[in-house]
Amino acid sequence: MGDWSFLGEFLEEVHKHSTVIGKVWLTVLFIFRMLVLGTAAESSWGDEQADFRCDTIQPGCQNVCYDQAFPISHIRYWVLQIIFVSTPSLVYMGHAMHTVRMQEKQKLREAEKAKEAGGTGTYEYLAEKAELSCWKEVNGKIVLQGTLLNTYVCTILIRTAMEVAFMVGQYLLYGIFLDTLHVCRRSPCPHPVNCYVSRPTEKNVFIVFMMAVAGLSLFLSLAELYHLGWKKIRQRLAKSRQGDKHQLLGPSTSLVQGLTPPPDFNQCLKNSPDEKFFSDFSNNMGSRKNPDPLATEEVPNQEQIPEEGFIHTQYGQKPEQPSGASAGHRFPQGYHSDKRRLSKASSKARSDDLSV
């Protein structure tokens, strides 16, 4: 087996900028696949061709039978599976780093323009803001957003398809378990030849283990798709429903809010001597009508009218109530509450006065 350090360093960077389920998936990939494959599984398949025996001395027959039994070695097949499954994550990491660098350059250009205009800024602050625009961490959880979220979802879809393809391919090539006896009927073997696999039980244990880990990785990928995709769809549907409710309630609310009284309407009612007829405009807006809108403005102005030598017609004079009028129909208290004496007529004789 080769050195896994190069691939491990890249996957560590992916681990830093993944969701919680993505971190679990990477942990499974590191421990249960790469570590087990590099230590235990490789030693079990190290002698498979040397210990593969057939009941024949025909030259080339044993090699042909081994090629028929193992089109590709299990260990090499799993290495290819790990590489193909990990490649989308590496592409995502490359796109994330490229996005961060581009945003850092953009922020730096904006800072230089602001500095020329009289502002200040630092590169470290801009780099931090650029990173937060791609992803943000809330309570220890990574929340992806923007184009980086779309790339991450595509990465999960590709690796899910790879997992399914390799699991189906392994089942079609080998099945689930290895047989101890393999019967070979290929040329140049003169007749059916019995061949024997080395340590089949130990190899079957690793085959089942690797299949189970692949199934676990597939389940985690589907769970992460649900976490990122389905919840986002539900949130958008909820927002659209709330927007429809606001649109339905919006016109009626604005109509009610648009019907407002004059600024001094309630104050005029409160300043009246008798507050029997006072009520807030907002409570019963259309219950009563003001018979004369100018009356509330003219009564306070009577204090400013100077007493001159002619008779004034005042709104505060109590009118005569007809005998047929009902007691329930009363004028507002402010209408005849002014008890000041009427302005007296001049003592000088006028031509139109009646002689007694």
UniProtKB/Swiss-Prot annotation:
Highly expressed in lung. InterPro entries: Connexin, Connexin40, Connexin_C, Connexin_CCC, Connexin_CS, Connexin_N, Connexin_N_sf, Cx40_C. The modification Phosphoserine is found at residues 351, 355. Residues 1-19, 98-163, 226-356 are cytoplasmic. The chain crosses the membrane at residues 20-40, 77-97, 164-184, 205-225. The keyword Phosphoprotein applies. Coiled coil: none annotated. It holds the Pfam family Connexin. The keyword Transmembrane applies. This is Gap junction alpha-5 protein. GO terms for cellular component: cell projection; connexin complex; gap junction; intercalated disc; plasma membrane. GO terms for biological process: angiogenesis; artery morphogenesis; atrial cardiac muscle cell to AV node cell communication by electrical coupling; atrial septum development; atrial septum morphogenesis; atrial ventricular junction remodeling; AV node cell to bundle of His cell communication; AV node cell to bundle of His cell communication by electrical coupling.
